[in-house]
Amino acid sequence: MNIQRAKELSVSAEQANVSFQGMPVMIQHVDESNETARIYEVKNPERELTVPVNSLEEI
C-alpha cells in the first residue's frame, strides 16, 4: 500500500479492508516521514503495532 492511500483509509469513516500479515487491521495513524503506520488488530484492538506502510494490503 502507498502512503497516500493509507492516509485516506486512516481518516475514512468506513471500515476499510486492510490486512497486515494476513490479519485484518485498522489504521490509526500514518507517519509520512518514516513511512510507517500505527495499526491495531480488528479482533484484538489493544494490540497496537507500528509497521511499514508497504507491508499493508487492501483486501
Curated annotation (Swiss-Prot):
It comes from Bacillus cereus (strain ATCC 14579 / DSM 31 / CCUG 7414 / JCM 2152 / NBRC 15305 / NCIMB 9373 / NCTC 2599 / NRRL B-3711). InterPro entries: SASP_SspH (IPR012610). This is Small, acid-soluble spore protein H 2. It comes from the Bacteria. It is found in: Spore core. Disulfide bonds: none annotated. Pfam families: SspH (PF08141). GO terms for biological process: asexual sporulation; sporulation resulting in formation of a cellular spore. The keyword Glycoprotein does not apply. GO terms for cellular component: endospore-forming forespore. Belongs to the SspH family. The lineage of its organism: Bacteria, Bacillati, Bacillota, Bacilli, Bacillales. The gene is sspH2.
